[in-house]
Amino acid sequence: RQEKMIDKFKEIAPVFNVENDYNNYYPSFQQNVTALGQIFGKENVAKEKLSALESKIDQVAKDAKGKTALLVLVNESKISAFGDGSRYGMVYQKFGFKPIDDSIKSSTHGQSVGFEYILEKNPDFLLVVDRTAAITEKANNAQKVLDNDIIKQTKAYKDGHIVYLDAANWYLAFGGLESMEIIAQELDRAVKK
């Protein structure tokens, strides 16, 4: 979205675009944090924060090894699944969860799915981003949408592994150091549950 405005911004001041590459998310995130550390003379702080984050992620990946997951985004009553090659692919690539479906089409808005799909795939963990809660005042929309007899048959539901992620963090603030620390903490709590 900001890409269209970069030239106009350059007329005002120097521009450094910290966009993350969804196909190579974590390395691009590291590059951005390192570059920002250099720009603000905080290279050591950036290095320390990245090192601590890497340790936390390694622990999550160790705990998540062999566990299947499906990350879905709930928008009003619609559900979209995100796979390994998506904007949320780092859940699988970096945090160690095994994608429940390797055939999910990679797209910005995910692949439209229904309750039956979730039951059919039956992941160990159902990771949920509530877009509606992130951009409106409708709290707990995803919980209401997923509170049904079909979802209650899933392994994730029965094992208490439906994880409602920090919607604003995952949908709006996704990509910064603080947001990545929150993501690591959320996923760490989820796998230890």
PLM features: what roles do these ranges have?
Residues 83-111:
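Alpha-helical, coiled-coil/dimerization segments enriched in small aliphatic residues
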Residues 1, 14, 122-126:
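Proline-aspartate-enriched helix->loop->beta-strand connector
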Residues 113-122:
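Short helices/loops that flank or line small-molecule/ion binding pockets
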Residues 8-76, 170-193:
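Extracytoplasmic substrate-binding proteins
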Residues 3, 111-112, 148:
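Structural motif corresponding to alpha-helix initiation and N-cap regions
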Residues 124-193:
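Structured C-terminal subdomain patch of bacterial secreted/periplasmic proteins
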Residues 1, 72-76, 131:
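Short, well-ordered beta-to-alpha junction loops that form the rim of enzyme active sites
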Residues 48-50, 102-107, 140-141:
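Short, flexible loop segments at the rims of nucleotide/cofactor-binding pockets, characterized by
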